Amino acid sequence: MDGESEVDFSSNSITPLWRRRSIPQPHQVLGRSKPRPQSYQSPNGLLITDFPVEDGGTLLAAQIPAQVPTASDSRTVHRSPLLLGAQRRAVANGGTASPEYRAASPRLRRPKSPKLPKAVPGGSPKSPANGAVTLPAPPPPPVLRPPRTPNAPAPCTPEEDLTGLTASPVPSPTANGLAANNDSPGSGSQSGRKAKDPERGLFPGPQKSSSEQKLPLQRLPSQENELLENPSVVLSTNSPAALKVGKQQIIPKSLASEIKISKSNNQNVEPHKRLLKVRSMVEGLGGPLGHAGEESEVDNDVDSPGSLRRGLRSTSYRRAVVSGFDFDSPTSSKKKNRMSQPVLKVVMEDKEKFSSLGRIKKKMLKGQGTFDGEENAVLYQNYKEKALDIDSDEESEPKEQKSDEKIVIHHKPLRSTWSQLSAVKRKGLSQTVSQEERKRQEAIFEVISSEHSYLLSLEILIRMFKNSKELSDTMTKTERHHLFSNITDVCEASKKFFIELEARHQNNIFIDDISDIVEKHTASTFDPYVKYCTNEVYQQRTLQKLLATNPSFKEVLSRIESHEDCRNLPMISFLILPMQRVTRLPLLMDTICQKTPKDSPKYEVCKRALKEVSKLVRLCNEGARKMERTEMMYTINSQLEFKIKPFPLVSSSRWLVKRGELTAYVEDTVLFSRRTSKQQVYFFLFNDVLIITKKKSEESYNVNDYSLRDQLLVESCDNEELNSSPGKNSSTMLYSRQSSASHLFTLTVLSNHANEKVEMLLGAETQSERARWITALGHSSGKPPADRTSLTQVEIVRSFTAKQPDELSLQVADVVLIYQRVSDGWYEGERLRDGERGWFPMECAKEITCQATIDKNVERMGRLLGLETNV
């Protein structure tokens, strides 16, 4: 068959490093004289001399020129194997390769032996001192014919996608006079053009091959000691390795190049600038596409220069996402078939650092006493009492274990519970006491641990902010007093309270009761809380003013907040802590009351303590509201200009309920016709009076009318009702033509400042704004109170700060009863812990669906509101 060869070796045990395509004719080989031994220098710098082998019928390798078939005219071009071994060799894809290219290719490289081994029985070669290799004549070997096996060379054609070499020795026929070091593939056509001076193996110059030429892959060793190396594996579409994965294409040859392939013809690129790299693109196989003995070399050359590296983006993404699999581990079986192994250890190190931080702190807390140091304590900003949790009565251990397996969305504070204390574990108290008593101990210990966290935050506020001379120099004494008020007195009161709580805990790890301590300090020590909460209005306004108008204050404040002791928390989060703490105390004490047996003497003491803390909360709320309302009244009164009979606005019993701008549709009579106009009005609604004004500027309003609140009637109206009404007037028609997007309602003033009845058609910008105005204006109407047991309950999952008087400020874990909801995203509700009503956005709340939890919340609200104090 054309293009095939019958290969004969001089010994069965010799591993040849060349390929045969055809058997040259006897007259072409035997009719030549023996030339002088040729010496040449290999590309790696080693001088090599080929000596003739004194054996009958054998020739030197240098005498047989290589015949290179060409596809254009089916002629053969004779080349010297020595020249091919020293120069770059042409391959089927039009590129060139040098003998040392196998060192860069993990699939084609083999280990080099330090010296030539001695002859062994069976016809192995022997290396004498002069460097000549004597090849004994073996018996005639069989002739290899197609179909080809993995041990036979495959012709390199453009249809094949992978080129390789054999891995097992093939016998060579000596009867035909072929040398063991010969490499002269034959062509299907005997006509050809011979090279000049074939005896010396010279070639005029490098032969440029086109992309259509079919060139066999020819390899010769660059050193003597490579004669016994095992050839690489044939990786072709017909090899067992390729057949193992089915009829998949490995890679196209056009991609196996170091240089960037452009759209233009690249055949003019210098051959020495191109390096062929063939590598399997198949990943995830059970084993590599080669022999086991070559696995180590495949791994060693993964990152060799010129190698084909693909999939870097996807690999780096997987490395950033998939954590826990070591891509760089030498034991990883997946590494052998990966195209690229980018080193991204930084991602894994950061993950280990931050993921282990919580576990380290948790272990430190579990094995220590109650409070061993501030470095392990949690600031009160990050502390969440279980008493505020709607599921606090349920077992939380399985829930915590389940949440650890998932991504934690909200910050989970690291703190100890009573069951986690080392003394409790050592004595086994959590297993010996009843479940109800254990929950009671947890509730008592939560008061102590939360007070410790709260005290720590107060000390940071005083040490880092209040006592900072640099910060004090940026503001006046009045501003500093409004900003920090009596925070030092509040901190001292908290310290006294905590000292007694901690002493009770140190006396006995099994705490009997703390209700007496809470009752005593609430009645006598916590008076500074009322003063501090009363100053809240001035505090907030002063801070906003300093941040807006004082750059030096803002710069120093930012520097202090970034200090590690402040843990990157803003100063405002420290300033509001006393208000947060005083409002949480009733819930903590109520939890203890629930866990205390009602027939026990401790229950009565606990109820008295709950009543005292509820009274404290009421005093703080009233003080804050009174100061805010009084200041607001004076501010508004100074901005009003009465064009009519003045109204005495300032009063200690009056406060602002809602304010805002609305669109009024007014009907005027001109001569014998009516005209409807649209104008903007600004309402100031107080708890007992409505002031109707027209806005002149941001701080100036002209009063047009006013009326007592009990003289107002409000009603909602829709577009359909207005258009279908038989008594539709011109103002309604004006609305239909010009303001179809507005949300309308009617306001009837039974008696205004002139004892006249006035009807107004008003429009709001949003549906929720209309609902809020209707609720505020009609709040005094005698409506029966809704049944709280039938109301929807929601839990606050995001804190919300009120920006208008009718809005409700909420903290995380607050429970609110919903009275009405608007489709554009607002709730009106009542806060469970103190009965305050107001509006807040839906996105801050999550509906409670568990009926048992709803019933418990209703019972708790009844207990808190039944203490004859507004908690």
UniProtKB/Swiss-Prot annotation:
One example GO MF annotation: guanyl-nucleotide exchange factor activity
Keywords: Cell projection, Guanine-nucleotide releasing factor, Phosphoprotein, SH3 domain
UniProt xrefs under InterPro entries: ARHGEF16/ARHGEF26_SH3, DBL_dom_sf, DH_dom, Ephexin-like, PH-like_dom_sf, PH_domain, PH_ephexin, SH3-like_dom_sf
GO biological process entries: endothelial cell morphogenesis; regulation of actin cytoskeleton organization; ruffle assembly
Upper classification of the organism: Eukaryota, Metazoa, Chordata, Craniata, Vertebrata
GO annotations of cellular component type: cytosol; ruffle
Keyword hit for Phosphoprotein: yes
Domain SH3 residue range list: 789-850
Domain spans labelled PH: 655-782
Feature: compositional bias, Polar residues: 173-192
Tissue specificity remark: Isoform 1 is broadly expressed, with highest levels in liver (at protein level). Certain mRNA species appear to be specifically expressed in prostate and liver.
Gene: ARHGEF26
Induction cue: Certain mRNA species appear to be up-regulated by androgens in prostate cancer cells.
Location(s), subcellular: Cell projection, Ruffle
Subunit structure: Interacts with ICAM1 and RHOG.
UniProt cross-references to Gene3D superfamilies, sorted A to Z: Dbl homology (DH) domain, Pleckstrin-homology domain (PH domain)/Phosphotyrosine-binding domain (PTB), SH3 Domains
Composition bias, Pro residues: 136-156
The protein's name: Rho guanine nucleotide exchange factor 26
Predominant place of localization: other
UniProt xrefs under PROSITE patterns: DH_2, PH_DOMAIN, SH3
Entry-annotated residues carrying Phosphoserine: S22, S392
